[in-house]
Amino acid sequence: INATYNNNTINLAKSSTSGAVTGISIEGMSPALSTAAIKVNNNLINSIDVSGAGSSSAITGISNSSASGVLNINNNTVRGCTSTGSTAGARFTGITNTGAVVNNININDNKLGDAIAGAISYSVFTNAPVYGIYNTQHPVTCSVSISNNDISGIVHSMGSASIQVYI
């Protein structure tokens, strides 16, 4: 099995005050299938806008929770995200893998923010956590490469009391 999510451009806006917004979400492969490959490459997640007053909506650029043999998330850009979220539920996660990938995880050459727009801008005081690249759940025998990623443009216009973890 090969699942390929390549060369997409995604623009999203959400004006409600709860829930979550995810640009690309891969899920459902369980139990682990060591011969499966998931490829998420060369995508642009652009301008996810969560604008409900006092929103607690989470923003995620790319998310994988499937248990494949190989996971490649390479050369993607997540940029121009904005939020009015003031609570911890309004977290920003650029790229996350929570799938129990068996053999290889490659999360390389991605940009969270670039010269055109930063990764995330909060327009209110917030305690929403910021996670750049978050990877967990793989077995100790899995080879992991998280290299040459660029994280920039994390803006808190009115201040922040949040944790920030970039990789």
Predicted regions and their residues:
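Surface-exposed loop/turn motifs in large extracellular/passenger domains
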Residues: 1-17, 24-52, 58-85, 91-120, ...
